[in-house]
Amino acid sequence: MSLSENQVSQIAHLACLSLNEAQLKDNTQNLNTITSLFEQLANIEIDGVEPMLHPLHMFQRLREDVVSEKEQLALFQSIAPKVRNGYYLVPTVIK
């Protein structure tokens, strides 16, 4: 599927974009390149290929869950404009 400059111009209008002639030609070429890549993907033969959840057939070794930062609540609350009972107070946005 190939897009014409007229179609790209309509897409740009719907996206509230203003394109000059050079930008229109460039974007038309770029979008046609992208759609041709999707066409290539659609034509790949995948019969007999099992879906996989992860490309690697091994489990990821995870590090031990250890606290790596020191407690800084008092420091952060000391520079906050308003704090009450350990909570930051902010202006009401929705009533």
Swiss-Prot record:
Catalytic activity reported: L-glutamyl-tRNA(Gln) + L-glutamine + ATP + H2O = L-glutaminyl-tRNA(Gln) + L-glutamate + ADP + phosphate + H(+); L-aspartyl-tRNA(Asn) + L-glutamine + ATP + H2O = L-asparaginyl-tRNA(Asn) + L-glutamate + ADP + phosphate + 2 H(+)
Top EC category: ligase
Domain of life: Bacteria
Description of how the protein assembles with itself and partners: Heterotrimer of A, B and C subunits.
Listed Pfam families: GatC (PF02686)
Protein name: Aspartyl/glutamyl-tRNA(Asn/Gln) amidotransferase subunit C
Known role: Allows the formation of correctly charged Asn-tRNA(Asn) or Gln-tRNA(Gln) through the transamidation of misacylated Asp-tRNA(Asn) or Glu-tRNA(Gln) in organisms which lack either or both of asparaginyl-tRNA or glutaminyl-tRNA synthetases. The reaction takes place in the presence of glutamine and ATP through an activated phospho-Asp-tRNA(Asn) or phospho-Glu-tRNA(Gln).
Record GO terms (molecular function): asparaginyl-tRNA synthase (glutamine-hydrolyzing) activity; ATP binding; glutaminyl-tRNA synthase (glutamine-hydrolyzing) activity
Recorded family membership: Belongs to the GatC family.
Phylogenetic classification of the source organism: Bacteria, Pseudomonadati, Pseudomonadota, Gammaproteobacteria, Candidatus Pseudothioglobaceae
Gene3D superfamilies attached to this UniProt entry: Glu-tRNAGln amidotransferase C subunit, N-terminal domain
Record-level GO BP terms: glutaminyl-tRNAGln biosynthesis via transamidation; regulation of translational fidelity; translation
EC number from the UniProt entry: 6.3.5.-
The keyword Cytoplasm is annotated on this UniProt entry: no
Protein keywords: ATP-binding, Ligase, Nucleotide-binding, Protein biosynthesis
PANTHER family referenced in this protein's UniProt entry, alphabetically: GLUTAMYL-TRNA(GLN) AMIDOTRANSFERASE SUBUNIT C, MITOCHONDRIAL
InterPro entries referenced in this protein's UniProt entry, alphabetically: Asp/Glu-ADT_sf_sub_c, GatC
